[in-house]
Structures are given as C-alpha cells and as structure tokens.
C-alpha cells in the first residue's frame, strides 16, 4: 500500500512537470511570435494562466504594450492576428489585448491595470 501511494505521488509530480513544461513551451512560442513582429514590444501574461489558477480550456490572456503614442486598427492586424493564429496552430485560445505604453500609463488607476501589474508575468 505504501509503494502504491509513493508511485501515485511520483506520477502526480511527473504530470505537474509535464504541464509546467507545456506552459513554458506555449509562453516561449508567444514570445517568439511577438519578437518576430516587433522585437521592442512588451508582452505580459495575465489572468488565470499567470495566477496558476487555470483549468482545462482556459485561454491565454496577453497584454501587448507598444512603443507608440496610440494603438491603431492596423496594430490589431499586425499584433493580434499572428498570436491568435498561433493559438489555432497549437489548439489554444490566445487573447491579445493591445495598449500603447502611454495609454497604459495614463490608465494606471483602473482595476485592470492594477491586476495586471500585480499578477502579470512578463513574456
């Protein structure tokens, strides 16, 4: 009985390691895709994936901060579409949210800004 419990713990640890490796692989893929588009853009993972409270089917919320005065419609095509396409390729849902650095700093008082700054993970 002790041997079975020990093997079960080892297997559970192995599964957690595999999940963590998969999460790192996806974060790295998002980082690489964004870097191909704009090496100077900053990205922050937020939401349940950043907090570690995700469940099967949770999406990947990513804040993208651009070094420009204002985000344009063309920026959504340039930045959002390639990340969403990556999600389709790896069977995940990636939800990019775009802000210019200036707009992000001007909205520092919002709950969204507070939560991202508190729990976000730079990718």
Over which residues does each language-model region extend?
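Short, aliphatic-rich beta-strand segments
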Residues: 61-65
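Catalytic core of pol beta-like nucleotidyltransferases
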Residues: 3-42, 50-56, 67-123
């Amino acid at each position: 009985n002790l041997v079975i419990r020990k093997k079960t713990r080892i297997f559970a640890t192995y599964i957690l390691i595999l999940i963590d490796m998969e999460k790192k692989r996806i974060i790295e893929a998002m980082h690489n895709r964004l870097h191909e588009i704009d090496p100077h853009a900053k990205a922050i993972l937020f939401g349940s994936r950043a907090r570690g409270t995700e469940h099967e089917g949770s999406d990947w919320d990513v804040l993208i901060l651009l070094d420009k005065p204002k985000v344009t419609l063309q920026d959504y095509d340039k930045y959002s579409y390639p990340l969403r396409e990556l999600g389709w390729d790896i069977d995940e849902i990636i939800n990019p949210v775009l802000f210019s650095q200036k707009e992000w700093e001007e909205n520092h008082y919002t709950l969204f800004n507070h939560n991202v700054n508190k729990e976000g993970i730079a990718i």
